[in-house]
C-alpha cells in the first residue's frame, strides 16, 4: 500500500510538472484534468480545491510555488479566502486582465467562472510590462511556469505566455475556466419569483452549455470588446488614420539572433531621420516601430496608408477603414514582403533569417489592423436591480480603457483595473451601499488613465488589493454618491450609443472662461475697448475695421506699449492693418485671417473672417479690467515686473501703468494719499522726481502763467475746459496720446502728431499722481525742463514721448530725413508750435467728459504748483529742440539758433540712445542711410535749463507732424514700423489655398508666411509630411514649405554659385572701400584692434548709437558709400534661412521652424516674431537681420553683471560719463537672474565653424552708433577691416560669408549654435552660403567686454573678437541663411541691449582720451586690443591648443599668445604690441592684480616657449579639449607634465592663494550681484535633477575623480551659464590663455586642488574623503570612473543632470578651489553659491570602466598575503562595477522607454487634435456656406443663431491650436532629452576604451560628442527657462483674472 502511495505521489508530481510546463491552452487543461482525477480533487469545490491540491503535491518545485501563492493569499484584505465567500462572479474573456481579475476574486473566496470562446492561446504579440507588473507576476510564481520570464533586463512577455501563466494560477486557485464557450447576453431574473427565485443568468453559445443555469451576482467584461455588456457609454478618441502591422518571425535562438538588440521603440518625434532613411531605401513609410525578442521575433509598426498603397499592400483606397483593411483589399504576399523589409532595415539586416511564425490558423503570423479610434468607457461599473436581485456589472482591460499600443500601458493599467474591480466586489459583498461602491469605483477609474510607472507607489512589496497601497494621494471620495445615481439602474436596460469625444485637455483658464456670447456681444465689447480713440467708430464687424485703426486701438487698449496709436495715419489702411496683424501674431499668437493689402482693397471686410479674428482678442482679453496703478501693483507686487509677457518693458513703464478708469474720482484727499504712497514706493529702477512728481503743465496754462492766484487758475481751467470740449469733435485731430505716469506723475513729452496749426498743447490733467483717469487714452501732454531732461536720462531713447512705443519711432524719425522734409521743416515747426493753433485746436475737444476732468485737474494742480514754473517749462520745451518759435513763445524765449534737421536716430545722449526699431527688410534701412548722409549732425541748442535731450524731443514733435499729416511719405517704409512681412503681390487671396488653389473657408484656413491654405495641404515639398504651424521651413524664392529635416534642400546649387560670386564681389568692394576710408579715422594706428572695436566717426553726432561690431575704420557713410552698395549684393538678395517660432505669443509655438530665403522681390520677409521685447531697445531687434540661432535665449536681462561691475569699480570709466549713469543705474536695478547666460552662447556659436579668414564686412547700412564706454580711443586702422589679407581659403569648398554691418542692435550673445539637424546637414556635405549678419551690440562692448581678469592681458571669451566672428556656426552649413532655433521664440533677441547704451561714449572726445590715462582705462584698452586679436589664430595655433596630446609643451603667457594672435592678424609678421603698448605702470598694476587673484595662473603658465601649431579648431572645441585633456592626464603628454605621478598624497601648496582670492571675489561687496547666478544655478540644478535622462544608479561613480578633472572645474566651459558673472572685478581672460593656465596644469602644481575640487562638487556625504587616496593613484581615465560602489556616498545612486551638466554657478571661479580639503567648507560654498561644475559632468558621463589597472594597496607592501588581498579586493570591485554597470544599463533603458512612451502619447495627442480640427473644419465649412448664402437652405435659418454656432466653433478651434502648440513644446523637450541621453551613453562607451589604445580619431570623437552634448544641455536649459517663464506668466494672468472676478463679487468654480 505504501508503494502504491509513493507511486501515486510520483505520478502526481510528474503530472503536476507536466501541468506547470504545458505550453498550450489545451495541453494545460488536459494536464489539469489528469491531475485532478489522479488526486481525486473536485474542481467545483472552489473553497477547498487549492488547499487540497497543495497538500497532495509536495515536491520541492511545487512547494516553492505554494510558498509564493500563500504569501500573496496572506494579505489581510482576503480574510483567508472568506471576504467574498458568498459571491458568484462571471468573467467574460480569458485574456490576461480577465484571468488576473479571476485570481483576485478567487483569493477573496468568490466562486469565479471564466468563459473563453477559444481553446488556443496563439497571440504571439508582446506586451510591455511595468515594474510593478513584473513584481506582481513574480509573486504569482511566473518564473516557475516560464523560466525566461523577465530574465535580466527583459521587461516584456508575449500575450500567449502571460495567458498561460495566469491560466495555470487561476486553475490552481479553484477558478472554473470554460473554453469554446461564447457569451451572448445577460438574462434578467424572471418576473415570477414566487415559484422560482432565479437570479441573473447569461445566455451562451452553445445554448445547452451547463453554464446556462449558472446564476451570478457579479459579471465582469474582459473580452476586449466594446459592447459586450450593455449600459456603458463610450468616448471615442480619434486620431488620424493609423494602420498597425504586427509580424512574428521564428526565433531559432541562435547566437547571431541573440546579438541583435531589441528596439523598445522608435518614435517619429525625435527619430525622423531613421524613418526617412527607411523610406528612401525601401519605400516603406512608418510612424513608429518596435522590436521585441521573445519566443518569436516580434515586430509591430504603424504604417502610413500611402506607403501601403504604393507598395501594393492595399489594393484600393477607400475612405471607410473597414473596407480599406478587409481581406479582399489586402495583398497578403505584399504585406509579408512589407513587414519583412521593415524588420530587416530596423535590425540593420542582422537577423540571419526572417521566416514567419505560424498562427493558430496555420498562416504566417502577420496581421494588419486599424487603431485610428480608441475608446474608453465613461464609467467603470454600474449596478442593475431586477426583481430584488442586484447585479454588479464591471469592465476591465481593453473593454474599459483601450490602450494606445506604442505606450505599453495596456497590461499594467489592465491589472490595476482588475485590482480595483476586485476591491469593489469586496466592498459590495461586505454590505457597503451600492451608490458608495460605485462612487468609490469611479473615483479610482478617474485615476487610471493618468497612471504611469512614475506616479504610482514604488514600494511594490506593499501592494495589496487596497488601492491606497497603489495610488499615492488617493482620494476615494472625489466622486460623490449622488453623482453616480444614473449608474444604479432599476428600469429597462438602456442602450447607449457611442459618443465621440475629443481628448484635448481643458485648462482651468479655458474652462472657466468659456464663452457663450453672441456676435452682438462681441461688437459691444469691441465698442467698449475702442471708445475714446480718434477716428475709431465701431458700428459693425465689417466696414468699421477697414482702416485698421480699430484693430490697433483694441491692441493698444490692452497693451499700449505695442502700438503707438498716435503715429498711425488713418489714410494708410494697408499699413495699419498689417501692423495690427503682425503685432497680434507676434505678441498674442493670433494668426491673421487676411493681409493688410486685402483688407484695405475691399470695401467691406468679410464678416465671418472678422468675427473669427476678433473672437480671438475677445477670448484673450475678456475679463481683463482696465488696470489702474494700484491694482497693477497689488496684483503683481510692489516691485512689479512690468515686463510680464514676452515684451520685457524695462523702462517703458509709462505705457503699462496708465490710469484707465473712465469715472473720475473727486476725493482729493484720497488721491493725494495715493499720490504720496506711490511716490514713496516709486519704481526701484527709476529716480524719484519730486520736483514734478505731481506737476502737470499745459500749453494753455502756460498762456496764463502770469497769474499766480488760484482763482485765476480755476478761471483758466474752466476756460481751457470749454476749449477742450469742442476740440475732440474735430475728426482731423489725431488722438492725443501724451500721458503722464500713473502713480508717479512724471510729465512726458507729447507724442501726438498734429496739423500745421497744432501745437503740443496738453490738457489740464494731473496735479496729483492719482488723477481721475482720462477718457481712454486721451491724455494731456506734460512738459518740463530739467525734469524732462531727467526723464530722458532715465528712459533710453526718450527723445520723444516715452509713452510712445519705441518701435514706432523708426517710421517717424526716418520720414523726417527726406529732402522735402528738410525744405519744409521751418514752416512745419512754426505751424506746429503756433499758440494760436493751439487755441484753435483746444476748441475742438469733446465736451462732457473732459469738463469734469479738467475742473478736477485744474483745482488740484494750481493749488499746489507755481504758474511761472509751469510757464518756464512750456516755454523752454517749445523754445528748444531746433523748432523755430514765434508768437507768444518767441517773445518769452528767444530762439537764437536756426532749426537743425534731426538726426536719423535721435536720442538725448549715448546713455539713452536707442536704435530705431528695425524692420526685417534691409532695403528701407538703406534708404535711411542715404538720407542720413545728407543730414548734418543736429545742433544741440540750449534754452534755459534744457539740455540737448530736449532738442531731440522737440524734433520728435516735428517728426510726428510730418508722419501723420503727410499723405504718404516715400522716405520710409512700413517695415520700419513693425517687423512684418510685406507679402509678394503674386500671392493668392485669402480664400484660395496656396497649395491646391481651391477654395479655403475661414474655419479651415491656416496661414503662414502670408499664404493661406487648408490644413491637409500644408505638407513638406520633399517628403509630403504633414507640417504644423509650429514647425516648418519656408523658401521665399521658391515659395515652398519644408519639414525640418528637409529644409536644407531649400536652395539649388546654381543659386549658391550665383550668390558666392556676388559675395566675392561685395567683399572685394568692401575691402577697397575700407582701405580708402581708413585714413579718415582719427585713431592711433599702433593699437591692435579687430572689427569688434567701436568708435564714433568724426561726423557722427554723439547721440547716434555706434555698433560695437562695426570696423573701426568705417566712418560715417556718405553718398559715395551708398553708391558702392549698388554693386554689392543687396541684403534682400542674401538668402537667410530662418527657423523661428511661428505664432509664439506665450511660447506656444515654440517649435516653429520657418526658413525664410529672402529675395529681391520679397525684401521684407523676415516677419520677426520676436519684436517688442524690451520697449526701450525694441528697435535693437527690429532692424536686425536673422542670426544663426539654435535655441534662442530665454532670460531677458543677462548682461548687467558687467554693468554692475563697472559701477562698483573705483577706476571705472563710467565716472567720466555722467550721462551714462541713469542707464547704468537702471541696469543695476534690473539685475538678470541669469547674469552670464549668453556668454555661453557666444562661446557655443563658434563651435563648429571654419576660421574667420574668409569674411569681409559689407558696407554699413546706417551711421555708426555711439561707442561703448569700454571702447578704446586708440584703435588701429590697420585692423579695421574684417577681412584678413594674410588668410586665404578655398572658396569652392567653403563659401565666403559676408556680414551685414548695418544693424547696430544685434547682440552677439544672440548667436547660438546651429541645431542638430543643421550639423547633420553639414556632415552630409551640403554646402551652402550663409551671409551671416553681424550681431551689433553696444551692450556687448560697453559692458561685457569690461569683464577682464585683473591678471590677464587678453579677453576672456573668444567671441569678443570681431564682427566677422559673430556667426560661424551657421556658416558651416554653407547656405546663405541664418538659423534661428525654434525653442524660445522671440525672446531670443536679448531684451536688454539698451542697457549697454548707457555706457556709450564718444572715443573721439577728449574726455575719452583722458579716461584712457586713468587706472583701468589703459588696461581696458589693452584688454580690448588683445581680445580683439586673440581668436584670429592660425590653424596651427588653434590646433595646438586643441591637440589633446599637446600637454607636453610648456604653456605660454597670455602676452605671448596674444602676440601670436596679432601675428596671425597681420598675416604672419609678429609684432609684440601686447607688451610694447603697455606702460611700466600699467604692467605693475596688472601684476598686482594678478597677485590679487592669487594663483589663477600656475607656474607652468609662466614658462614661455615658442612652438609650431597645427590647423585651427573652434573655440568651443578648444574648451572641450581642455576639459577632456585635463581628464587624460595619464596619457603620454600628461605624464610629461606630471613630474610626480606616483605621489601618494594630495600635495599642498599654491592653490591656497588662488582659492582664497577667488572666494574673496565671490564674497566681496559685490557678492550680492551673484545671487541671480546662484538662483539660476539652483534652478538649473533642480531641472536637471528632475528631468535627467541619465542613469539613476551611477552617481556613486562620480566620486573617484582625478585631480585634474576636478581642477578643470575652473574652466569657463561653454555650458557654464554663470561663468562670466563670477568675478565682478575681474577682466575677461583670453580663452586660449585661460585654458593653457587652468586646464593644462598638473596636480603637482596645484597640490590641494584635487580635494577642494572634489569637495566643490557639492557631494553631501563626507564619505568621499575615504577614496581620495584611490583617486590620486589612478592613472587611467577609466580608473577615475571605477570607484567601487561602497566607496561612494551612501545612497548617492542617482547621477542626475545636476551633476552631469549643471552650469557653473555665478561664483564658479570662487568654487574652483577651496582651501579646505575636508570638503565641508566646499560643500557649504557650493550649497550657498550655486550648482556644481559642468566640467565635473564628464565624470558622470563616463561609464565606470573595467578593471582598475593599479592595485590600490600601498606599494611599500611586500607581503604576499597583502598582495593577494589586494587582488581579491580588485576582483570584488570589478564584480561590483559590473553589477553597477548592469543596473545603469537597465536604468538607462527604463529612461529610454519612458521617453518613448511620452513621445508616443504626444504623437497620438497631436493626431487626435488634428482629427478634431478636421472635424471642426467640416462643421465650420457647412456653417460658413449657410452664412454666406452659398447653401440651399441659407435663408431659412436665423443668422444670429448661426453666428453663435460659428463663434463657438471658432473658440474651439482656438483652444485646439493652443493645445497643439503646447504638445509641440513638450515634444521638443523630449527630443532634446533623448538626444542628450544617447550622446551620454555614446560618450560612456567611448571612454571605456583604454587610454593607451586611443588614437587621434578616438579622442576627436569623444571631443565632438562632448561638444554636442553640451549644446543639447544648453538647449534644454533654455527651453525649461522659457517654459518656466510661460508658467509664471500664466499663473500671474490667472491670478489677475481671479482678483478681478472676486472684486466683482463673483465666485470662481474651477472645472
Swiss-Prot record:
Gene Ontology BP term (one): heart development
Ranges where the record places region Interaction with MAPK1: 1314-1353
Reactions catalysed according to its record: L-methionyl-[F-actin] + NADPH + O2 + H(+) = L-methionyl-(R)-S-oxide-[F-actin] + NADP(+) + H2O
InterPro entries in UniProt: bMERB_dom, CH_dom, CH_dom_sf, F-actin_Monoox_Mical, FAD-bd, FAD/NAD-bd_sf, Znf_LIM
Localization of this protein: Cytoplasm; Nucleus
Motif Nuclear localization signal, residue numbers: 660-681
Cofactor dependence: FAD
Note on domains (UniProt): The C-terminal RAB-binding domain (RBD)(1796-1945), also described as bivalent Mical/EHBP Rab binding (bMERB) domain, mediates binding to predominantly Rab8, Rab10, Rab10, Rab13 and Rab15 (in their GTP-bound forms).
Name assigned to this protein: [F-actin]-monooxygenase MICAL2
Taxonomic lineage of the native organism: Eukaryota, Metazoa, Chordata, Craniata, Vertebrata
Amino acid at each position: 500500500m505504501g508503494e502504491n502511495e509513493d507511486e501515486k505521489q510520483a505520478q502526481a508530481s510528474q503530472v503536476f510538472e507536466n501541468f506547470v510546463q504545458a505550453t498550450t491552452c489545451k495541453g494545460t487543461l488536459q494536464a489539469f484534468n489528469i491531475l485532478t482525477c489522479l488526486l481525486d480533487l473536485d474542481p467545483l469545490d472552489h473553497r477547498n480545491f487549492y488547499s487540497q491540491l497543495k497538500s497532495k503535491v509536495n515536491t520541492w518545485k511545487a512547494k516553492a510555488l505554494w510558498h509564493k501563492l500563500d504569501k500573496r493569499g496572506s494579505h489581510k484584505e482576503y480574510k483567508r479566502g472568506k471576504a467574498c465567500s458568498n459571491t458568484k462572479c462571471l468573467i467574460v474573456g480569458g485574456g490576461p486582465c480577465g484571468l488576473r481579475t479571476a485570481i483576485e476574486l478567487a483569493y477573496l473566496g468568490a466562486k469565479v467562472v471564466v468563459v473563453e470562446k477559444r481553446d488556443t492561446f496563439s497571440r504571439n504579440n508582446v506586451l510591455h510590462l511595468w515594474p510593478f507588473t513584473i513584481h506582481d507576476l513574480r509573486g504569482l510564481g511566473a518564473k516557475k511556469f516560464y523560466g525566461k520570464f523577465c530574465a535580466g533586463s527583459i521587461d516584456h512577455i508575449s500575450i500567449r505566455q502571460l495567458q498561460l501563466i495566469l491560466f495555470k494560477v487561476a486553475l490552481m486557485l479553484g477558478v472554473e475556466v470554460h473554453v469554446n464557450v461564447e457569451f451572448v447576453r445577460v438574462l434578467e431574473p424572471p418576473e415570477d419569483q414566487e415559484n422560482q427565485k432565479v437570479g441573473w443568468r447569461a445566455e451562451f453559445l452553445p445554448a445547452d452549455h451547463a453554464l446556462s443555469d449558472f446564476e451570478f451576482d457579479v459579471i465582469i467584461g474582459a473580452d476586449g470588446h466594446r459592447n459586450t455588456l450593455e449600459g456603458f457609454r463610450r468616448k471615442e478618441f480619434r486620431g488620424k488614420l493609423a494602420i498597425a502591422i504586427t509580424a512574428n518571425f521564428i526565433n531559432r535562438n541562435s547566437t547571431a539572433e541573440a546579438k541583435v538588440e531589441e528596439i523598445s521603440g522608435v518614435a517619429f518625434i525625435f527619430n525622423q531621420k531613421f524613418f526617412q532613411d527607411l523610406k528612401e531605401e525601401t519605400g516603406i513609410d512608418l510612424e513608429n516601430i518596435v522590436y521585441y525578442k521573445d519566443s518569436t521575433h516580434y515586430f509591430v509598426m504603424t504604417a502610413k496608408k500611402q506607403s501601403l498603397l504604393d507598395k501594393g499592400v492595399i489594393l484600393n483606397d477607400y475612405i471607410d477603414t473597414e473596407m480599406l483593411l478587409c481581406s479582399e483589399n489586402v495583398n497578403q504576399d505584399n504585406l509579408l514582403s512589407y513587414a519583412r523589409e521593415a524588420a530587416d532595415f530596423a535590425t540593420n539586416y542582422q537577423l540571419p533569417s526572417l521566416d514567419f511564425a505560424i498562427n493558430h490558423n496555420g498562416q504566417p503570423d502577420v496581421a494588419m489592423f486599424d487603431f485610428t479610434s480608441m475608446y474608453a468607457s465613461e464609467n467603470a461599473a454600474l449596478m442593475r436591480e431586477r426583481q430584488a436581485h442586484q447585479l454588479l456589472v464591471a469592465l476591465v482591460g481593453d473593454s474599459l480603457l483601450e490602450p494606445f499600443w506604442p505606450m505599453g500601458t495596456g497590461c499594467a493599467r489592465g491589472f490595476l483595473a482588475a485590482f480595483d474591480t476586485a476591491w469593489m466586489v469586496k466592498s459590495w459583498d461586505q454590505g457597503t451601499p451600492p451608490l458608495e461602491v460605485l462612487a468609490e469605483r469611479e473615483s479610482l477609474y478617474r485615476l487610471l488613465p493618468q497612471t504611469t510607472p512614475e506616479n504610482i507607489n514604488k514600494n511594490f512589496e506593499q501592494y495589496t488589493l487596497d488601492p491606497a497601497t497603489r495610488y499615492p494621494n488617493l482620494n476615494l471620495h472625489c466622486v460623490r454618491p449622488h453623482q453616480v445615481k444614473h449608474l444604479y439602474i432599476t428600469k429597462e436596460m438602456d442602450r447607449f450609443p457611442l459618443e465621440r469625444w475629443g481628448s484635448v485637455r481643458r485648462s482651468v483658464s479655458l474652462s472657466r472662461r468659456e464663452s457663450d456670447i453672441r456676435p452682438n456681444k462681441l461688437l459691444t465689447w469691441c465698442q467698449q475697448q475702442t471708445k475714446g480713440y480718434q477716428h475709431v467708430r465701431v458700428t459693425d464687424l465689417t466696414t468699421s475695421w477697414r482702416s485698421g485703426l480699430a484693430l490697433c486701438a483694441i491692441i493698444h487698449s490692452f497693451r499700449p506699449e505695442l502700438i503707438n496709436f498716435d503715429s498711425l495715419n488713418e489714410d494708410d489702411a494697408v499699413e495699419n492693418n498689417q501692423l495690427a496683424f503682425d503685432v497680434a501674431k507676434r505678441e498674442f499668437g493670433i494668426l491673421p485671417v487676411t493681409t493688410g493689402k486685402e483688407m484695405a482693397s475691399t470695401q467691406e471686410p468679410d464678416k465671418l473672417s472678422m468675427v473669427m479674428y476678433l473672437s480671438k482678442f475677445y477670448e484673450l482679453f475678456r475679463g481683463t479690467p482696465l488696470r489702474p496703478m494700484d491694482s497693477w501693483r497689488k496684483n503683481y507686487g510692489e516691485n512689479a515686473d512690468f515686463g510680464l509677457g514676452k515684451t520685457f518693458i524695462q523702462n517703458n513703464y509709462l505705457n503699462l501703468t496708465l490710469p484707465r478708469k473712465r469715472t473720475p474720482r473727486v476725493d482729493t484727499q484720497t488721491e493725494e494719499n495715493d499720490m504720496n504712497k506711490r511716490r514713496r514706493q516709486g519704481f526701484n529702477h527709476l529716480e524719484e522726481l519730486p520736483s514734478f512728481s505731481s506737476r502737470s503743465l499745459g500749453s494753455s496754462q502756460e498762456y496764463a502763467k502770469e497769474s499766480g492766484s488760484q482763482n485765476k487758475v480755476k478761471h483758466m481751467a474752466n476756460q481751457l475746459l470749454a476749449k477742450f470740449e469742442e476740440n475732440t469733435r474735430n475728426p482731423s485731430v489725431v488722438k492725443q496720446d501724451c500721458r503722464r505716469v500713473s502713480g508717479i506723475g512724471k510729465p512726458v513729452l507729447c507724442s501726438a502728431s498734429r496739423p500745421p496749426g497744432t501745437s503740443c498743447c496738453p490738457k489740464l490733467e494731473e496735479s496729483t499722481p492719482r488723477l481721475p483717469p482720462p477718457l481712454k487714452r486721451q491724455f494731456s501732454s506734460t512738459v518740463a525742463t530739467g525734469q524732462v531732461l531727467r526723464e530722458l536720462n532715465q528712459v533710453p531713447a526718450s527723445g520723444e514721448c516715452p509713452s510712445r512705443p519705441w518701435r514706432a519711432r523708426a517710421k517717424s524719425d526716418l520720414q523726417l530725413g527726406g529732402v522735402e522734409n528738410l525744405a519744409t521743416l521751418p514752416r512745419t515747426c512754426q505751424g506746429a508750435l503756433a499758440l494760436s493753433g493751439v487755441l484753435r485746436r483746444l476748441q475742438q475737444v469733446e465736451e462732457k467728459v473732459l469738463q469734469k476732468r479738467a475742473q478736477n485737474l485744474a483745482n488740484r494742480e494750481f493749488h499746489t504748483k507755481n504758474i511761472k514754473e509751469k510757464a518756464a517749462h512750456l516755454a523752454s520745451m517749445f523754445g528748444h529742440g531746433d523748432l523755430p518759435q514765434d508768437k507768444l513763445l518767441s517773445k518769452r524765449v528767444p530762439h537764437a539758433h536756426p532749426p537743425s534737421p534731426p538726426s536719423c536716430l535721435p536720442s538725448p545722449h549715448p546713455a539713452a540712445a536707442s536704435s530705431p526699431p528695425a524692420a526685417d527688410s534691409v532695403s528701407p534701412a538703406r534708404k535711411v542711410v542715404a538720407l542720413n548722409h545728407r543730414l548734418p549732425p543736429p545742433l544741440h541748442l540750449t534754452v534755459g535749463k534744457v539740455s540737448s535731450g530736449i532738442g531731440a524731443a522737440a524734433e520728435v514733435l516735428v517728426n510726428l507732424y510730418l508722419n501723420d499729416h503727410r499723405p504718404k511719405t516715400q522716405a520710409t517704409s512700413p517695415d520700419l514700423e513693425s517687423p512684418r512681412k510685406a507679402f509678394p503681390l503674386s500671392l493668392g487671396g485669402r480664400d484660395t489655398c496656396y497649395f491646391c488653389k481651391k477654395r479655403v473657408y475661414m474655419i479651415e484656413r491656416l496661414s503662414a508666411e502670408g499664404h493661406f491654405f487648408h490644413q491637409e495641404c500644408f505638407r513638406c515639398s520633399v517628403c509630403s509630411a504633414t507640417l504644423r504651424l509650429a514647425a516648418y521651413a519656408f523658401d521665399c524664392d521658391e515659395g515652398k514649405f519644408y519639414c525640418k529635416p528637409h529644409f536644407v534642400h531649400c536652395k539649388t546649387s546654381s543659386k549658391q554659385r550665383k550668390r558666392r560670386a556676388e559675395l566675392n564681389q561685395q567683399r572685394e568692394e568692401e575691402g577697397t572701400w575700407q582701405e580708402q576710408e581708413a585714413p579718415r579715422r582719427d585713431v592711433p594706428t599702433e593699437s591692435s584692434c579687430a572689427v569688434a572695436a567701436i568708435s564714433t566717426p568724426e561726423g557722427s553726432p554723439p547721440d547716434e548709437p555706434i555698433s560695437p561690431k562695426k570696423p573701426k575704420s568705417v566712418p560715417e557713410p556718405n553718398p559715395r558709400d551708398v553708391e558702392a552698395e549698388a554693386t554689392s549684393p543687396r541684403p534682400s538678395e542674401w538668402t537667410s534661412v530662418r527657423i523661428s517660432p511661428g505664432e509664439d505669443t506665450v511660447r506656444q509655438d515654440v517649435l516653429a521652424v520657418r526658413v525664410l530665403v529672402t529675395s529681391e522681390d520679397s525684401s521684407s520677409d523676415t516677419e520677426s516674431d520676436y519684436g517688442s521685447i524690451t520697449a526701450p531697445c525694441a528697435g535693437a531687434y527690429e532692424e536686425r537681420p536673422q542670426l544663426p540661432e539654435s535655441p534662442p535665449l530665454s532670460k531677458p536681462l543677462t548682461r548687467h553683471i558687467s554693468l554692475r561691475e563697472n559701477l562698483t569699480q573705483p577706476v571705472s570709466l563710467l565716472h567720466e560719463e555722467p550721462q551714462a549713469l541713469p542707464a547704468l543705474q537702471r541696469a543695476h536695478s534690473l539685475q538678470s537672474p541669469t547674469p552670464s547666460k549668453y556668454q555661453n552662447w557666444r562661446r557655443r556659436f563658434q563651435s563648429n565653424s571654419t576660421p574667420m579668414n574668409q569674411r569681409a564686412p559689407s558696407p554699413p547700412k546706417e551711421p555708426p552708433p555711439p561707442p561703448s564706454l569700454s571702447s578704446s580711443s586708440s584703435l588701429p586702422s590697420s585692423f579695421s577691416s574684417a577681412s584678413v589679407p594674410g588668410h586665404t581659403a578655398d572658396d569652392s569648398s567653403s563659401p565666403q560669408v559676408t556680414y551685414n554691418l548695418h544693424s547696430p542692435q544685434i547682440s552677439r550673445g544672440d548667436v547660438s549654435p546651429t541645431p542638430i539637424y543643421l550639423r547633420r546637414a553639414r556632415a552630409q556635405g551640403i554646402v551652402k552660403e550663409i551671409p551671416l549678419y553681424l550681431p551689433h551690440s553696444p551692450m556687448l562692448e560697453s559692458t561685457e567686454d569690461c569683464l577682464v581678469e585683473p591678471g590677464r592681458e587678453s579677453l576672456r571669451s573668444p567671441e569678443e573678437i570681431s564682427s566677422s566672428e559673430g556667426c560661424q556656426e551657421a556658416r558651416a552649413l554653407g547656405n546663405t541663411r541664418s538659423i534661428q532655433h525654434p525653442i524660445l521664440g522671440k525672446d531670443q533677441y536679448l531684451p536688454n541691449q539698451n542697457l549697454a547704451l548707457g555706457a556709450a561714449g564718444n572715443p573721439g572726445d577728449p574726455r575719452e582720451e583722458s579716461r584712457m590715462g586713468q587706472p583701468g582705462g589703459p588696461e581696458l584698452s589693452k584688454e580690448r586690443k588683445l581680445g580683439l586679436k586673440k581668436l584670429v589664430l592660425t590653424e596651427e595655433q588653434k590646433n595646438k591648443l586643441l591637440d589633446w596630446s599637446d600637454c607636453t609643451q610648456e604653456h605660454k603667457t597670455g602676452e605671448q599668445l596674444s602676440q601670436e594672435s596679432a601675428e596671425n592678424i597681420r598675416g604672419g609678421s609678429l609684432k609684440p604690441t601686447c607688451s610694447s603698448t603697455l606702460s611700466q605702470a600699467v604692467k605693475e598694476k596688472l601684476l598686482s592684480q594678478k597677485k590679487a587673484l592669487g594663483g589663477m595662473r600656475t607656474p607652468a603658465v609662466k614658462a614661455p616657449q615658442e612652438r609650431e601649431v597645427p590647423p585651427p579648431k573652434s573655440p568651443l572645441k578648444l574648451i572641450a579639449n581642455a576639459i577632456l585633456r585635463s581628464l587624460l592626464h595619464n596619457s603620454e603628454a600628461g605624464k610629461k607634465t606630471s613630474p610626480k605621478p606616483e605621489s601618494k598624497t594630495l600635495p599642498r601648496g599654491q592653490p591656497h592663494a588662488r582659492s582664497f582670492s577667488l572666494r574673496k571675489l565671490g564674497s566681496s561687496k559685490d557678492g550680492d550681484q551673484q545671487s541671480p547666478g546662484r538662483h539660476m544655478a539652483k534652478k538649473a540644478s533642480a531641472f536637471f535633477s528632475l528631468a535627467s535622462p541619465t542613469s539613476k544608479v551611477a552617481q556613486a561613480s562620480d566620486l573617484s575623480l582625478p585631480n585634474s578633472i576636478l581642477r578643470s572645474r575652473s574652466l569657463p566651459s561653454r555650458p557654464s551659464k554663470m561663468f562670466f558673472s563670477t568675478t565682478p572685478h575681474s577682466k575677461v581672460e583670453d580663452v586660449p590663455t585661460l585654458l593653457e593656465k587652468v586646464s593644462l596644469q598638473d596636480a603637482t602644481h596645484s597640490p590641494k586642488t584635487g580635494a577642494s575640487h572634489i569637495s566643490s562638487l557639492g557631494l553631501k556625504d563626507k564619505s568621499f574623503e575615504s577614496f581620495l587616496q584611490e583617486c590620486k593613484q589612478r592613472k587611467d581615465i577609466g580608473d577615475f570612473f571605477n570607484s567601487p560602489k561602497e566607496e561612494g556616498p551612501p545612497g548617492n545612486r542617482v547621477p542626475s543632470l545636476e551633476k552631469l551638466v549643471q552650469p557653473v554657478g555665478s561664483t564658479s571661479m570662487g568654487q574652483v578651489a577651496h582651501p579646505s580639503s575636508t570638503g565641508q567648507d566646499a560643500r557649504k560654498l557650493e550649497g550657498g553659491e550655486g550648482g556644481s561644475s559642468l566640467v565635473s559632468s564628464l565624470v558622470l558621463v563616463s561609464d565606470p570602466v573595467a578593471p582598475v589597472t593599479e592595485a590600490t594597496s600601498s606599494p611599500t607592501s611586500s607581503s604576499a598575503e597583502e598582495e593577494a588581498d589586494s587582488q581579491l579586493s580588485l576582483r570584488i570591485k570589478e564584480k561590483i562595477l559590473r553589477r553597477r554597470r548592469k543596473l545603469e544599463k537597465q536604468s538607462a533603458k527604463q529612461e529610454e522607454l519612458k521617453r518613448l512612451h511620452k513621445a508616443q502619447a504626444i504623437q497620438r495627442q497631436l493626431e487626435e487634435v488634428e482629427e478634431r480640427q478636421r472635424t471642426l473644419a467640416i462643421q465650420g465649412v457647412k456653417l460658413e456656406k449657410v452664412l454666406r448664402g452659398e447653401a440651399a437652405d441659407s435663408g431659412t435659418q436665423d443668422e444670429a443663431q448661426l453666428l453663435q454656432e460659428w463663434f463657438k466653433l471658432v473658440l474651439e478651434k482656438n483652444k485646439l491650436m493652443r493645445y497643439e502648440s503646447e504638445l509641440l513644446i513638450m515634444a521638443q523637450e523630449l527630443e532634446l532629452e533623448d538626444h542628450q541621453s544617447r550622446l551620454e551613453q555614446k560618450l560612456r562607451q567611448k571612454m571605456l576604451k583604454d587610454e593607451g589604445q586611443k588614437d587621434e580619431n578616438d579622442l576627436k570623437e569623444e571631443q565632438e560628442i562632448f561638444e554636442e552634448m553640451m549644446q543639447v544641455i544648453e538647449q534644454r536649459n533654455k527651453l525649461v527657462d522659457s517654459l518656466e517663464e510661460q508658467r509664471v506668466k500664466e499663473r500671474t494672468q490667472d491670478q489677475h483674472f481671479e482678483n478681478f472676478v472676486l472684486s466683482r463679487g463673483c465666485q470662481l468654480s474651477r472645472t
